[in-house]
Amino acid sequence: MGILLILLAILAFFLLWGVAVYNGLITSRNGYRNAFAQIDVQLQRRFDLIPNLVETVKGYMAHERETLEAVVAARSAAQSGLAAAKAHPGDPEAMAQLAAAQGQLNAGLGRLLAVAEAYPDLKASQNMMQLTEELASTENKVAFARQAFNDAVMAFNNKRDVFPSSLIAGTFDFAPAVQLAIPGDRAEMREAPKVQF
């Protein structure tokens, strides 16, 4: 009878341990999904600003139609990438699609703003100044949200990969999550601004 109680106690311990690890993995997965929702909010804000930016510069840059169309197309592709990533945050394919689309959009916006520099009246426009300020602020919020997401993904993956949690993760198919790295962002951050007199 005593051995049976000891075996039941050991079984109960491992069962409770398994439930605790499983719940921890679920909590961690929900954490990175919530962090992705914050990226979604900021990217939607960015997408909402782009049509206003395009409308503002359209009158000044009539012969730069190709640049404007590239930004609009990149915005559309980025929205599609966001929809795929929103459905499966942390999924390698969805994150790669979103990263590529955001990289394209960053490049298009960079070209648009570079071309806008050639139009002094446009640069001095109050509407353009306000839009570029809002866009820069939103870009900072996207970067912050992306960092929070990547931190949450790393915490989930660490929890998922360490022994003995990896036993529960493998049993219940907790796939590793993938961080979001947008092409071009890191290079721009490493490169110091050039000052010339």
Q: For each of these PLM feature ranges, what is it?
A:
Residues 1-197:
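A helix-centric hydrophobic-segment signal that preferentially recognizes long
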